[in-house]
Regions:
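Helix N-cap/capping motif at the beta->alpha junctions
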Residues: 35-44, 65
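A Lys-centered signature of the CheY-like receiver
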Residues: 102
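Two-component/phosphorelay signaling modules centered on CheY-like receiver
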Residues: 2, 14-34
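Active-site beta3 strand of CheY-like receiver
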Residues: 49-55
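Conserved binding/recognition cores within well-folded domains
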Residues: 117-136
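Receiver (REC) domain active-site loop signature in two-component systems and cognate sites
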Residues: 58-60
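Conserved sequence signature across two-component system core domains
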Residues: 10-11, 36, 54
Length: 136
C-alpha cells in the first residue's frame, strides 16, 4: 500500500483553503487532515495530529505564518503560500521547503508537493541510517 502524506492547510482566505483542498484531493498520495483559518487553531492541530506537509499562508489575522514557523517545535515540511514573493527568502531561512504564489497554479502546486515529499523521504532515510549507526 502506498503511503499517504497528511496535509494541513492554513489560510485566512476561504477561497484559498477551498482551492488548495481541491488540489490536495486530486493527488492520490495526499490526505487532507484539516483546514484552518488562523494560526492558533493550526498549532492545536499540529500538536494533536501527525502532519507531514503544511501549506501555510504568511499573512493571517492572529499570528503571521513567519511567527508560526518560529513557534513550531517539530516542523512538518512547510510550503508557504503568499501573494508576496519578497517573503520567500526569509521563509527559506526558517526551513520552508518551497512556496506558492497566489493566485495558485496546479502544476506549481504539484512541483512544491513533490519537493516536500522528497524532503520528507530524505529525512526519513537519514533518520533510519542514523538509528542504524547508533546501534552499531
Amino acid at each position: 500500500m502506498k503511503r499517504k502524506f497528511n496535509v494541513l492547510i492554513v489560510d485566512d482566505e476561504f477561497l484559498a483553503r477551498k482551492l488548495l483542498s481541491e488540489y490536495v484531493s486530486k493527488v492520490d498520495f495526499l490526505q487532507l487532515i484539516d483546514t484552518c483559518s488562523d494560526a492558533t487553531k493550526a498549532m492545536e492541530v499540529i500538536n494533536e495530529e501527525h502532519i507531514d506537509i503544511l501549506l501555510l499562508d504568511i499573512q493571517m489575522p492572529d499570528i503571521s505564518g513567519m511567527e508560526m514557523l518560529k513557534l513550531m517545535n517539530n516542523k512538518p515540511a512547510v510550503i508557504l503560500t503568499t501573494a508576496y514573493s519578497e517573503y520567500a527568502v526569509d521563509a527559506f531561512a526558517l526551513g520552508v521547503v518551497d512556496y506558492l504564489l497566489k493566485p495558485f497554479d496546479y502544476a506549481r502546486f504539484l512541483q512544491a508537493v513533490n519537493k516536500a515529499v522528497n524532503t520528507i523521504s530524505t529525512e526519513t532515510q537519514s533518520d533510519a541510517v542514523n538509528d542504524y549507526l547508533m546501534v552499531k
